[in-house]
Amino acid sequence: MIKVRRNRKDREVLAMKQVKMMSLNAREKDNALNEVRLLASIDAPNVISYKTAFFQETGNTLCILMEYADGGDLSGLIQKKKETKRRFSENFIWQVAFDILQGLRTLHDNKVIHRDIKPANIFFVGGVAKLGDLNVSKVMEGKYASTQTGTPYYTPPEIWNNQKYDGRVDVWSLGCVLYELAKLQPPFLARDFPGLSRKVTAGYY
């Protein structure tokens, strides 16, 4: 759950993400704490900035305060375009590509793979596109990772095939997002996961 809060000291508007820990399994709890660690370690213009985090014993809730995205997220913008039957301009698509590639460069330079690039995780602050939601991101300890994660429509072949992967999976996912901006639908569509997997691994769209 995301709420909007205002800092009492400087009146800055912030987003507060509330995670009810009691309702999570062990892996989900690790992901929530992982997001705090990663946000605190990254300071970049194209990554949503972290402010602080605290734990509310009442309700057993982890609260993460971060930069507020006044322009919402990309999934909301796509939905509006679908409703009005209008397209994004080419300049807008190029700007999103540039901004997010800058964010990915920062993450990858810090040996972090985002692993869940999708419209809902791309936010806009003052017109600038920024990466957010790092809860399934991973700090690379070696050359490759192998854990299956991500959102199916934007998941690259390596993960579908249970192969080892590196930061290039984020570039694949971004490519899927940019395709969706141009066509207003993801490049790979299917009725079920097996069908989606076959299309992605064959490169058939």
Regions found by a protein language model. Give the residues of each.
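Short beta-strand micro-motifs within the conserved protein kinase catalytic domain, predominantly
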Residues: 49-59
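AlphaC helix of the protein kinase catalytic domain
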Residues: 75-87
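Catalytic-loop of the protein kinase fold
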Residues: 108-124
